[in-house]
């Protein structure tokens, strides 16, 4: 299978509190992606500041960190063909009001500050985010037997 890659997807505290984790997992599984790592975690302020370090000069940074630190986060690594690009498509636009119906944000979110989930925006950032949130031994390598029925 060409363009096999991994992406980091996180269900943010609002998504966890609203009971959307299972639905979000289903969206990725139904599309044909393979879940290789998952944990429910409250990583703390320092970890979140590192994750969002590219936004640290933005006026909303402190509020973002406070919100992300307000409850558990479901951190996941998904693997498959064009996982980063397709994962972002499944999530929808960062601003839920600009997200198409049928996307996670288009179906479950209304406010940019409570947009339910995070997804890596590039292959390079996916690698960095996966390394920040997971140890190498937490990434499971297993055979996705339905892959033959999903990919040529």
Swiss-Prot record:
ATP binds at residues 12, 60, 88, 94, 105, 115. InterPro entries: NDK-like_dom (IPR034907), NDK-like_dom_sf (IPR036850), Nucleoside_diP_kinase (IPR001564), Nucleoside_diP_kinase_AS (IPR023005). It comes from Neurospora crassa (strain ATCC 24698 / 74-OR23-1A / CBS 708.71 / DSM 1257 / FGSC 987). It comes from the Eukaryota. It holds the Pfam family NDK. It catalyses: a 2'-deoxyribonucleoside 5'-diphosphate + ATP = a 2'-deoxyribonucleoside 5'-triphosphate + ADP; a ribonucleoside 5'-diphosphate + ATP = a ribonucleoside 5'-triphosphate + ADP. Gene3D superfamilies: Nucleoside diphosphate kinase-like domain. NCBIfam families: PRK00668.1 (NF001908). GO terms for molecular function: ATP binding; metal ion binding; nucleoside diphosphate kinase activity. The active site is at 118 (pros-phosphohistidine intermediate). This is Nucleoside diphosphate kinase. GO terms for biological process: CTP biosynthetic process; GTP biosynthetic process; UTP biosynthetic process. Coiled coil: none annotated. Homotrimer. Major role in the synthesis of nucleoside triphosphates other than ATP. The ATP gamma phosphate is transferred to the NDP beta phosphate via a ping-pong mechanism, using a phosphorylated active-site intermediate. Its cofactor is Mg(2+). Belongs to the NDK family. The keyword Flavoprotein does not apply. Its EC number is 2.7.4.6. Keywords: ATP-binding, Kinase, Magnesium, Metal-binding, Nucleotide metabolism, Nucleotide-binding, Phosphoprotein, Transferase.
């Amino acid at each position: 299978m060409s363009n096999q890659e991994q992406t980091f997807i996180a269900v943010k505290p609002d998504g966890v509190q609203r009971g959307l984790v299972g639905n979000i997992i289903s969206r990725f599984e139904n599309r044909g992606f393979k879940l290789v790592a998952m944990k429910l975690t409250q990583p703390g302020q320092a970890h979140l500041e590192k994750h969002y370090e590219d936004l640290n000069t933005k006026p909303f940074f402190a509020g973002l960190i406070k919100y992300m630190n307000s409850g558990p986060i479901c951190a996941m690594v998904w693997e498959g063909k064009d996982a980063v690009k397709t994962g972002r498509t499944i999530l929808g636009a960062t601003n839920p009001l600009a997200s198409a119906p049928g996307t996670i944000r288009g179906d479950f979110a209304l406010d940019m500050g409570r947009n339910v989930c995070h997804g890596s925006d590039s292959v390079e950032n996916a690698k960095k985010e996966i390394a920040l949130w997971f140890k190498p031994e937490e990434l499971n390598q297993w055979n996705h037997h339905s892959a033959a029925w999903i990919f040529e």
